Amino acid sequence: MPQPIPKKRKTYTNNPRNAAISMVSSQHPLNVRPSGNLYLESGPASGATREELMGDFALFPEELLLEVLGFVDDAQALKNLSHASRVLYAYLYDEELWKKHYTQKAQAQEKEGVEPPKIKWRGSWRLSILGLDAQYEAKPQIPGNMLCSDVLFRPFQCSQVDYTSIFWRVIKEEELYHRDSLATQEPLDEVLPSGRIPRLPESSLTQEVFDKSWSNKPFIMTNSDSSRWPHWDLAALLERFADVKFRQEAVQWPLSLYSQYLAKNRDESPLYLFDCNSKAMQTLKSEYVVPEVFQKDAFKVFEKCRPDHAWLIIGSQRSGSTFHKDPNCTSAWNAALVGRKLWIMLPPDVVPPGVSTDDDESEVTSPVGIAEWVLSGFYNDCVNNTSAQIGITFPGECMYVPCGWWHMVINLDDSVALTQNFVPSIRLGNALNFMKNKKKQVSGFRPAEVKNALEEILAACQDDEDAETIRNWVRKFDELNLKENLQNEDCGELLESELPAMPILELFKLLLTKNGKTEELAKGLEDLAKLEKSELAKVTGKSEMWTKLTEAPSFSFGFALNE
C-alpha cells in the first residue's frame, strides 16, 4: 500500500524589514524649522532678529530656557510671556512644557491627598490648561529662517509620525503570518526566516512543550476562537466605567476624560493608560482566563504581599513603551484585544541600540522617546542585529515575553490590551538569582504587606539562617517607626537609608516550602547555582573547572622544556 505523501509546509521569503524613515515632514504650525535650515538662508533677513525678539532670554541655550520655563507654575504668567514676541510664543507653544506644568502639579496634589483641579480636554495641553478653544488659537508665523530649532521642531515631527507607513514592510509580512497561522492552526516556527517571532496555536501548546522548548523564547500564541478574549473596546469600557479613574502614567483621570485625550492630542509620547488598581480592574480581572501554560506561577505564593502583576492597558496610536526588562526577572504575557502592537525584542545579554546601562543594569538610560528612536535609525540598527526578534500582535493574539528579555512596544493603532507578569516554575532559578544578586533592583513589594507576611511565616517556620534574617529585618522595621506613606511605598522607590533591603529571597523560599513546592524550590536553587557559576565565568573569564585545577597544590602544565 503506497504511503501518503507528507504535506509540504509553506516556506517564507526572508524579505528586508527596514523602516522607511526617509519621510517628508509636515510644516510646523508656527513655521519653526529644523536647525539645518540655518545653512540654507537665501538672503539677508529683514526686520527684527531672533535675538532682538527674545531680549535677555536669547542668552540662554534652548534646553536651559525650556528647563527654566518649566519651573514657572503660573499658567497666566506663561501665557503673558508668550505674548511678548512671536519667537517667545513659539517656545511657549511647546506641548511638553505645558504637559509638565499640569502633571507635576497633579502628582504633588495626589501625594498630599488633594483632588487635582478638573480639566476639560481641548486637544492639547496648552489649550486645555488655558481654557482656549482650538478655533481661537493664534498661530503667528515665524518669517523665513528666523527660528531654526531642532529642540522645538523634532518633538513636533515625532508627534506627526505615521508608523503604518514607516513599518509597511513588517506589517505586510506579519499580516500574512497572522492569516496563515489561523488558517492552518499549525505552528509557524522553523518555517519563518530568522528575526521573526514564531506563532503557536494555544490548543497545541502543552505545559510540557512550553517548559521544554518555549519558556526562554518569545512567541505569539494564536487562537481562532473569537470569544477567547474579552471584547473590551473603548466604547464598551466607557459604557461601564466612564466615571471610574484609571492610572495614566503621571495622572489619574476618569476614563471619559482619557478617551477625549486619546482621540486628539499633540504629544510626542502620548499618555499610556496602565492600570492595575482601579475599581474597574478589580471587576475586569474576573472576566478573562489566563492561558493554561501560564498558570503555573511561582509568585502566587506571595499572595497578599505580591507586587501588582495584572494590568489593563489602553493607548492611542503612536503610544507605547520604550526598551525595558520586566521587574523582578518575571516573564509576561500580553493579549491584544483591540489594535495592532509592534514588538521589538532582544535577548537578556544584548543591550538595544540607543540604550545604555551600567554593569548590573541598575541604571538604564534611553535618552530618546519611541519616535525619536525610530527616526534616528536605531530601529534599522536593530533589524541588522541577528539576535533581534520583531513581530506584530493582532487582536486576539497573545505575546509571551521571557524573563530578562529587552522589549519595546509600539501601538500601530488605538489599542486595548491585557497583560500579566508571572514566574513560570521552570524559570524559578532566574527569579531566585535576581532576588539574591540584584537585591537593590527588587521592586513592587510594599513594606507593610511584606512585614505582615514575614510575621506570619515566622510563626510557622523552624529556626534557621533564613528565619534569623527575617527576624532581624522585622525588628529593624519596628525600630524605624516608618510613616504610613513609606510603609505602603513600592520598595523600589525607597532609599536604603529609609529602610534596609527587604528579605524577599528568604521569604520566597519559606513560602514555597510552606505551599508544598519543595521540589520546584530544589530545582530552582540548583538552577540558581548554575547561573551564578556561569556569571562568575563571564566576569573572571575562567570556568569553575579551570579554577579548581589552578588552585590545586601540585598543579603544573607538565611541559618538559629540557627535552
Predicted segments, located by residue:
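N-terminal accessory scaffold of Fe(II)-dependent oxygenases
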Residues: 2-398, 408-563
